């Protein structure tokens, strides 16, 4: 009986090791974990060519978060993307990762009523802003997010007026600070605020302001919140 238990434990242990050795996050982390702080800063700046980084991400993003974002944004090519990024350090790395199915494009999940793991939040927000600007009927999942826009209209009416004046004067919101306090509702309130402005400033400018303002960590937290509903 004792012998059987040991065999079973060994099988479980070997299985866990196999999962860890084939998990893309773990494979990519092996290449990042020994980088110096200066080297990692170079990696972050090079990553901005492939990932949506907010202003705060350049100083606060961790290696784990960066890896998770690369895997999520490029599930079939995360190894190639990391290899390209590492060229900024004059390092030629070889990352062998088995690819998986590509995530669903936002245009296909418009009929879904719940957020899923394979949906990118950036895709969701970009398409949502476009739907609002172009007055396209919203599916169930987008209707949930649209409640944040309604809330923003009631909560930030004065601030929205000032933002519109700023845009009409300068033609952009590049140096405009969103009047959204940083708390657990920061991401959803930012989405709601920018959604109200989307018909005025255009969905592209609204989306890039969202990326500039909301960090990857905050986006990931919000995605988990959406998935839990």
Swiss-Prot record:
The keyword Repressor does not apply. Induction: Expressed in the early phase of the viral replicative cycle. Disulfide bonds: none annotated. It holds the Pfam family Poxv_Bcl-2-like. Keywords: Early protein. It comes from the Viruses. Belongs to the orthopoxvirus OPG034 family. This is Protein OPG034. It comes from Vaccinia virus (strain Western Reserve) (VACV). The lineage of its organism: Viruses, Varidnaviria, Bamfordvirae, Nucleocytoviricota, Pokkesviricetes. The gene is OPG034.
């Amino acid at each position: 009986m004792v012998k059987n238990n040991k065999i079973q434990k060994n099988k479980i242990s070997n299985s866990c090791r196999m999962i860890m050795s084939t998990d893309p996050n773990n494979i990519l982390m092996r290449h990042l974990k020994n980088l110096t702080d200066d080297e990692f800063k170079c990696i972050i700046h090079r990553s901005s060519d492939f990932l949506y980084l907010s202003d705060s991400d350049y100083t606060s993003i961790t290696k784990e978060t960066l890896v998770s974002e690369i895997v999520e944004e490029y599930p079939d090519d995360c190894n190639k993307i990391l290899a390209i990024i590492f060229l900024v350090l004059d390092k030629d790395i070889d990352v062998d990762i088995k690819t998986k199915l590509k995530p669903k494009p936002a245009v296909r999940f418009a009929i879904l009523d719940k957020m899923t793991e394979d949906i990118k939040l950036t895709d969701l927000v970009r398409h949502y802003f476009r739907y609002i600007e172009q007055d396209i009927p919203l599916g169930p999942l987008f209707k949930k997010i649209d409640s944040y826009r309604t809330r923003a209209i009631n909560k930030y009416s004065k601030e929205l007026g000032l933002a519109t004046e700023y845009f009409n004067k300068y033609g952009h919101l590049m140096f405009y600070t969103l009047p959204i306090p940083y708390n657990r509702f920061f991401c959803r309130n930012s989405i709601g605020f920018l959604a109200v402005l989307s018909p005025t400033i255009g969905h592209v400018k609204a989306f890039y302001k969202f990326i500039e303002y909301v960090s990857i960590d905050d986006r990931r937290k919000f995605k988990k919140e959406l998935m839990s509903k």
